[in-house]
Amino acid sequence: MYSLARPFLFAFDAERAHALALRAIDTAYRTGTTALVATRPVPLPTPAFGLMFPNPVGLGAGLDKNGEHIDALLALGFGFVEIGTVTPKPQEGNPKPRMFRLPEYQAVINRMGFNNLGVDVLVKNVQRARRRGGLLGINIGKNKDTPNEEATSDYRYCMERVYPLADYITVNISSPNTAGLRELQEEQALRRLIADLRETQEALAAQHGKRVPMLVKVAPDLNDRDIDAAARVLADLAVDGVIATNTTVTRTLVASHPMAEQAGGLSGAPLLGQSTLVLRRLRARLPESIPLIGVGGITSGADAVAKMAAGASLVQCYSGLVYRGPRLIGECVDAIRRRRESPSGGAVGPL
């Protein structure tokens, strides 16, 4: 079905095509025809962060920034859906055009800039959702006009608002499209921010009588020293999990493409190698008590298995869906199932 729709969608610019695809998914959900678009995978229960996921394949943040499509997306067969990135105040993001396809590479470049309607709107949307069939992550960020020195207040505000509704919360400090945001990954800044948010998390757990896991999403462009420093901080502060990785600012593998010079984060197939290297190094540096979600470059079941082999407990797709459609979800679940049932049991490979 998606193979028939893709030429139509690709006739539009990438951001417009995303909106049309979401509208189609919503229509299928409302009319009970989602089965024509995607086949729900056989459950593959997977534990992580103290939660039980129906299957280990999720949707990465960015597609549903305001939580407007949660039920329709879960109906496609995802084990979990991550919405956002959401900020305290609404913001328009960067000027359009700000999303570009590189079909020859199964890649996307975006410089969206945390465009969203604000956390209060997202909360209302989540409250309306039925949330059947999977878990919900909420990805939080800071407004672009909030200086890094005051970033903690933005993250804290968002965490307080979404805490009662989220199955897990992701702290996004790694988007390349908000000026200066990645500076929060530097060791001392990271330690200050995460220490404060861990205190907030524990206070909210006491207030609400439940503990919602807090994850941190990191960039693929960290060098080995930066990865080791980040791992040290995240282990010291006992975060619940890490998502590896966000998009990359490097263009080495797509340098010949006419869109390669567009500013923004590159995602899709060219990101697979670098994001998986970061994932593998983090797995070697972090205690087993901190699970990892592998994201970046998954366009096949084999790619999902590569993430699991590098140490991921769960995986997420996004750009791969642009090129493969919803069938990618079931393909990834089935590939991970075969790996799990293999005699080796899926041990992590060497660094």
Curated annotation (Swiss-Prot):
GO annotation (BP), single: 'de novo' pyrimidine nucleobase biosynthetic process
Binding of substrate, residues: K65, N110, R111, M112, G113, F114, N172, N177, N246, T247
Membrane topology summary: Peripheral membrane protein
Enzyme class name: oxidoreductase
InterPro entries: Aldolase_TIM (IPR013785), DHO_dehydrogenase (IPR050074), Dihydroorotate_DH_1_2 (IPR012135), Dihydroorotate_DH_2 (IPR005719), Dihydroorotate_DH_cat (IPR005720), Dihydroorotate_DH_CS (IPR001295)
Chief subcellular location: membrane
Pathway(s) the chain acts in: Pyrimidine metabolism; UMP biosynthesis via de novo pathway; orotate from (S)-dihydroorotate (quinone route): step 1/1
Active site: S175
Keyword annotations of the record: Cell membrane, Flavoprotein, FMN, Membrane, Oxidoreductase, Pyrimidine biosynthesis
Gene3D superfamilies: Aldolase class I
GO cellular component: cytoplasm; plasma membrane
Reactions it catalyzes: (S)-dihydroorotate + a quinone = orotate + a quinol
Tree of life domain: Bacteria
Chain positions recorded as FMN binding sites: A61, G62, L63, D64, K65, T85, N139, N172, K217, T245, G268, G297, Y318, S319
KW Chaperone (keyword) present: no
The family this protein is said to belong to: Belongs to the dihydroorotate dehydrogenase family. Type 2 subfamily.
PANTHER family according to UniProt: DIHYDROOROTATE DEHYDROGENASE (QUINONE), MITOCHONDRIAL, DIHYDROOROTATE DEHYDROGENASE (QUINONE), MITOCHONDRIAL-RELATED
Functional description taken from the UniProt entry: Catalyzes the conversion of dihydroorotate to orotate with quinone as electron acceptor.
Oligomer status and interactors: Monomer.
Protein name per the record: Dihydroorotate dehydrogenase (quinone)
Organism encoding this protein: Xanthomonas campestris pv. campestris (strain ATCC 33913 / DSM 3586 / NCPPB 528 / LMG 568 / P 25)
